């Protein structure tokens, strides 16, 4: 298609003017942006990293993780922090709920000595701290726990029973407008944990909604819905949860995928169990009866023993993880081949059998 040379000259002139005024890279042709391959941080779950499409949560973006109580929201964010710290990144945790357990965080691999933590008095203070950390360019990951606990100053200073309609929504809307651009500039990942509420009078459709208004829904590049779907038992004792995460929104890859994994109490995401399941599904690990083998060598009888072997041999676990990431991230639809047990059933920790 023939382009008017006068238009080309005018466009070149205005692009030079914009870059001179606002800095290099402030405007460019989309095809020339070589940074479209987004930097990511692992969630701690291989299947969730694959479901996200990019291999983890994207840097420089806003992410919302929501779900019912005790579904694993904080655990998932602590796994992200631990993964980021292993890469030498600086992380901050804004504990608006005043409920962060440092002992549990340490068990998940979080370096609590180097984790920045704030327990703000008001929602405005929490969001101002987020903005200051973001603009510094020195913090890579910020977690806010939770949006529901970000109480506006006017509500705290008022009386119980006073009406404060829309205050939290306005506060979040203003904060999102301010934070979004700064996060992109500083390449900081900001994760909001959110709670679920029920809409009154909804007869058709989903009555569930999240707190804090609609601004976060629009500004978030990724939204994850996390649910507990079953119990993991060791004998009669419940030792963990079967967990399902749905990618409700995704601006960096295809949305609406889901991942299933186990969260063990006091240990976090069961990575080795996930490696065993995915390894068998994609024929990296052989299964004959109850025995599991890798490259001809038996690694354990029963899923739990195979997982224990991988825990004791991290080099082999890393090798399997790397191979699976190369396979699944180049072909995300391959994840659908994983044969999961029904999420409505309980799973025996020792044998992996449904009961």
Swiss-Prot record:
Record carries keyword ATP-binding: yes
Intracellular or extracellular location(s): Cytoplasm
Binding site for ATP: 67-74
One example GO MF annotation: damaged DNA binding
InterPro entries linked to this entry: AAA+_ATPase (IPR003593), DNA_recomb/repair_RecA (IPR013765), DNA_recomb/repair_RecA_CS (IPR020584), P-loop_NTPase (IPR027417), RecA-like_C (IPR049261), RecA-like_N (IPR049428), RecA_ATP-bd (IPR020588), RecA_C_sf (IPR023400)
Disulfide bonds: none
Cellular component GO terms, alphabetical: cytosol
Any one GO BP annotation for this protein: DNA repair
Sorted UniProt keywords: ATP-binding, Cytoplasm, DNA damage, DNA recombination, DNA repair, DNA-binding, Nucleotide-binding, SOS response
Role description: Can catalyze the hydrolysis of ATP in the presence of single-stranded DNA, the ATP-dependent uptake of single-stranded DNA by duplex DNA, and the ATP-dependent hybridization of homologous single-stranded DNAs. It interacts with LexA causing its activation and leading to its autocatalytic cleavage.
Family from the record: Belongs to the RecA family.
HAMAP family: RecA (MF_00268)
UniProt xrefs under NCBIfam families: tigrfam_recA (TIGR02012)
Listed name of the protein: Protein RecA
Organism (species): Shewanella baltica (strain OS155 / ATCC BAA-1091)
Organism classification: Bacteria, Pseudomonadati, Pseudomonadota, Gammaproteobacteria, Alteromonadales
């Amino acid at each position: 298609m023939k382009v008017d040379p006068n238009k080309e000259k005018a466009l070149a002139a205005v692009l030079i003017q914009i870059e001179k005024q606002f800095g290099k890279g402030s405007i460019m042709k989309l095809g020339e942006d070589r940074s479209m391959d987004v930097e990511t941080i692992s969630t701690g779950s291989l299947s969730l990293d694959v479901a996200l499409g990019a291999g983890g949560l994207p840097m420089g973006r806003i992410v919302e993780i929501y779900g019912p109580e005790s579904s694993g929201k904080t655990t998932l964010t602590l796994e992200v922090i631990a993964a980021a710290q292993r890469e030498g990144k600086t992380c901050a945790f804004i504990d608006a709920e005043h409920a962060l357990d440092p002992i549990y965080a340490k068990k998940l691999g979080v370096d609590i000595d180097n984790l920045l933590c704030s327990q703000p008095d008001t929602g405005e203070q929490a969001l101002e701290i987020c903005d200051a950390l973001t603009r510094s360019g020195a913090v890579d990951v910020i977690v806010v726990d939770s949006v529901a606990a970000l109480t506006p100053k006017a509500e705290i200073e008022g009386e119980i029973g006073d009406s404060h309609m829309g205050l939290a929504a306005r506060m979040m809307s203003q904060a999102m407008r301010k934070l979004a651009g700064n996060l992109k500039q500083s390449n900081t990942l900001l994760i909001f944990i959110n709670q679920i509420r029920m809409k009154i009078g909804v007869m058709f459709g989903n009555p569930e909604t999240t707190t804090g208004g609609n601004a976060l829904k629009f500004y978030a590049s990724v939204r994850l819905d996390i649910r507990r779907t079953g119990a993991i038992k060791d004998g009669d004792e419940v030792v963990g949860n079967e967990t399902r995460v749905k990618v409700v929104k995704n601006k960096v890859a295809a949305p609406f995928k889901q991942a299933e994994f186990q969260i063990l109490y006091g240990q976090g995401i069961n990575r080795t169990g996930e490696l065993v399941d995915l390894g068998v599904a994609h024929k990296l690990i052989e299964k004959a009866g109850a025995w599991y083998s890798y490259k001809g060598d038996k690694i354990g009888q029963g899923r739990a023993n195979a997982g224990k072997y991988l825990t004791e041999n991290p080099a082999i676990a890393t090798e399997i993880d790397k191979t699976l990431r190369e396979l699944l991230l180049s072909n995300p639809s391959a994840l659908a081949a994983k044969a999961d047990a029904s999420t409505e059933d309980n799973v025996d920790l020792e044998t992996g059998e449904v009961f």
